Amino acid sequence: MRKAERARTTNETDIKLAFEIDGEGKADISTDVPFMTHMLDLFTKHGQFNLTVDAKGDTEIDDHHTTEDIGICLGQAFLEALGDKKGIKRYGSALVPMDEALAQVAVDLSNRPHLEMRAAFPQAKVGTFDTELVHEFLWKLALEARMNLHVIVHYGTNTHHMIEAVFKALGRALDEASSIDPRVKGVPSTKGML
């Protein structure tokens, strides 16, 4: 079973998270950040993961700490759930349309954390959610999961649609990269390690 749990309690947040790679797209998400709850639900469904999140934070200030710490916990749980990475495909990508928006995500589960993001969101907020937090979440996810993550929003006019396409593509790309390929013997690297 490729799964892991994480808990993180600080003066700013209290987060409990359980993640399973080989899931059924089941999400049980409770956060103080409604837009993030929605995005995590989409990510889980499109990645065919199982994800449980209970997150509370100092959202009276803003959504930054909660969003960032969810990214940290999810990245750590994803890395642990991958185990030794033997037999995984390692690479994954997805191109996802959402009405007028088109987003592309490519990932390498390489143990070399990096985020490259090209997205010009037309609005600074979706509801009360600061759209700059999408980058913050993705960077913490990439850093803690030790993945090389590339995100491109090719175009779009509706900020909600653009971000939604990103999270759907992220789920699909990570599903592909983490899937087991029976042809792969050991870790998928000519170095013999990742």
From Swiss-Prot:
HAMAP family (UniProt xref): HisB (MF_00076)
InterPro entries the UniProt entry points to: IGPD_sf (IPR038494), ImidazoleglycerolP_deHydtase (IPR000807), ImidazoleglycerP_deHydtase_CS (IPR020565), Ribosomal_Su5_D2-typ_SF (IPR020568)
Keyword Zinc-finger (UniProt): no
Organism classification: Bacteria, Bacillati, Bacillota, Bacilli, Bacillales
Family: Belongs to the imidazoleglycerol-phosphate dehydratase family.
Gene Ontology terms: biological process: L-histidine biosynthetic process
GO molecular function annotation: imidazoleglycerol-phosphate dehydratase activity
Record-listed E.C. numbers: 4.2.1.19
Primary location recorded for the protein, binned into one broad class: cytoplasm
Localization: Cytoplasm
Pfam families with a match to the protein in the record: IGPD (PF00475)
First-tier enzyme category under EC: lyase
Database matches in SUPFAM superfamilies: Ribosomal protein S5 domain 2-like
Signal peptide stretch: none
Pathway annotation from the record: Amino-acid biosynthesis; L-histidine biosynthesis; L-histidine from 5-phospho-alpha-D-ribose 1-diphosphate: step 6/9
Keyword Lyase: yes
Swiss-Prot/TrEMBL keywords: Amino-acid biosynthesis, Cytoplasm, Histidine biosynthesis, Lyase
GO cellular component: cytoplasm
Catalyzed reactions per annotation: D-erythro-1-(imidazol-4-yl)glycerol 3-phosphate = 3-(imidazol-4-yl)-2-oxopropyl phosphate + H2O
Protein name: Imidazoleglycerol-phosphate dehydratase
